[in-house]
A protein has these predicted regions:
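Peripheral, non-catalytic segments flanking oxidoreductase cores
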Residues: 1-169
């Protein structure tokens, strides 16, 4: 899901990609409300993180806020299906990549699998922690900070079990 915009919004009327209303299932009845509330909470968390980046850079705390007035941020509910490790020993749940936005905020289930690449080039697992978020710097923040905050290279390892996560990109 993404920012819910009405059909009469100027960006929707102009036909801008990724702008408009979301498509929602009818059931379960509280699904939409729950996801919309979670999405808004994650947007606020992302805004606070961006304020911290700005303050760390010696800028006004609102420096990055106006760049998120109509965010293209997407909340994705991800499922990485179980793979037969004997047949697919090197198969990744998601290959190495960086995210495009300013900051990605995610939770992962107890299975784990998220790995980040250190500056030295080693892959290290991010252990799941109940009630905690993982925040990865995105590519646009790397550009905005002239590389001071590099985008986080990460991947999802296959542990041979179903894995679930929720990510705001």
């Amino acid at each position: 899901m993404a920012l819910e915009l009405p059909l009469d919004d100027p960006d929707v009327k102009a036909g801008k990609p990724f702008h408009g209303p979301n498509v929602w299932p009818r059931n379960p009845p509280q699904f939409r409300k729950t996801l919309e509330e979670y999405y808004q909470a994650l947007l606020l968390l992302g805004e606070q993180i961006c304020r911290c980046f700005a303050l760390d850079l010696g800028l006004d705390e609102n420096y990055f806020v106006d760049k998120h007035s109509k965010p293209l941020a997407q909340l994705r509910l991800l499922h990485y299906p179980e793979l037969d490790m004997s047949r697919h020993p090197d198969q990744q749940g998601a290959g190495a990549h960086t995210d495009y936005g300013s900051v990605a905020i995610l939770t992962q289930d107890s299975i784990g699998g998220l790995e980040i690449k250190t500056r030295e080039g080693q892959w290290i697992p991010i252990e799941p922690t109940d009630g905690a978020f993982v925040c990865n710097v995105g590519h646009i923040m790397e550009i905005w900070t002239n590389g001071l905050y590099p985008a986080t290279w990460h991947r999802v390892a296959n542990h041979g079990r179903d894995r679930y996560s929720q990510v705001l990109f």
